[in-house]
Amino acid sequence: MYKRQAIPGHNLPLGALGVFILWFCWFGFNCGSTTAATYNLGDIAMTTNLAAAAATLVTLIVTWVRYGKPDISMTMNGALAGLVAITASCDVVNDYEALFIGAVAGVVVVFAVEFFDKVVKIDDPVGAISVHGVCGALGTLFTGIFGEGCSFITQMIGFVAAVSYTHLRAHETRHDLV
């Protein structure tokens, strides 16, 4: 047996550039998803930016406290976690709720990455499960809690349906490969 050892990213500036490009393009994604240029495009852009900024700052602080130094790579994942978490509710929450959603995503992504790496032992070098799966689910559920005109029960049904469908398809695929 060999000892597992992470291979650290070799070019943080290039990784940061990628995150900033994604952050910039997320405005088009969230604003464009409304399918109509209405009065609330500015609000959508603002909630998108606030959630990402809050997640970035909170992830930086959490990693600094937890590891004794800021983890820039994890902080970049925090920015993406905030963007993913706000996507479902960007048009139905206010600025303070967007800050809260981003801040929670910033904390959750750190512990989710550790959980999948150390407990579940899944090789996820970029933290995609934590960023997109966990923080996406979190954002979906927060839409039901904070979203104007949204129901938590409806969001929970959608979440359970998506997880169930994914589990069934993955189980079928696994048997097809054997």
What are the functions of these language-model segments?
Residues 9-13, 70-79, 127:
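Cytoplasmic-side transmembrane-helix entry/capping segments in multi-pass membrane proteins
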Residues 3-9, 69, 114, 118:
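Membrane-interfacial helix termini and the short, flexible loops that connect transmembrane helices
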